[in-house]
């Protein structure tokens, strides 16, 4: 059985990290080799991305220039994520280790695109990257996502939201995800992310068992 490359996608607050952790634990209970490998990574470019999203790194004030800048950074980090000789996705798959990633190039299309020119630009940056075996899209209404983000902010001592965790931005991102997955030709599982955590986990497990 070949190792699987599974991508969890969704807007901020949709539960990708939680479900990624639960899926990793499921694989481990089954005695299967697996890693959870999120984007952005903890590599050098990934750290720059986090600084930019938190406002701690110079970025352009113009929205389109900012998204173009982020598009380049995410693509560079994605290349590192895929092809790092020790911990990269390709290396892990070659070792028969399942790879779960929270976010992939779909996120770049969803977050960094506002016009058709943006779509073409981001697609060019990511066109050489391999397709995942499965995409699990955690679909969540924006209002519920904002509620969850607010709750999380309180738990984290009022840490400021990242620039992508704003209502207007999330509405645009959700719309872009709808566009992406309406035309996606690969293997896709779209799930209701408003379900309780355990119920959503079981739905993911059911789908994963079909993949194996």
UniProtKB/Swiss-Prot annotation:
Record-listed E.C. numbers: 2.7.4.9
Keyword Transmembrane helix: no
Gene Ontology cellular-component annotations: cytoplasm; cytosol
Enzyme kind, highest EC tier: transferase
InterPro entries, per the entry: P-loop_NTPase, Thymidylate_kin-like_dom, Thymidylate_kin_CS, Thymidylate_kinase
Biological-process GO terms, alphabetical: dTDP biosynthetic process; dTTP biosynthetic process; dUDP biosynthetic process
Reactions listed under catalytic activity: dTMP + ATP = dTDP + ADP
Binding positions (ATP): 10-17
CDD domains reported for this sequence: TMPK
Entry keywords, A to Z: ATP-binding, Kinase, Nucleotide biosynthesis, Nucleotide-binding, Transferase
Coiled-coil ranges (or none): none
Intrachain S-S bonds: none
SUPFAM superfamilies: P-loop containing nucleoside triphosphate hydrolases (SSF52540)
A GO molecular-function descriptor: dTMP kinase activity
Keyword presence, Signal: no
Alphabetical list of Pfam families matching this protein: Thymidylate_kin
Similarity field: Belongs to the thymidylate kinase family.
Protein purpose: Phosphorylation of dTMP to form dTDP in both de novo and salvage pathways of dTTP synthesis.
Record protein name field: Thymidylate kinase
Lineage: Bacteria, Bacillati, Cyanobacteriota, Cyanophyceae, Synechococcales
GN (gene name): tmk
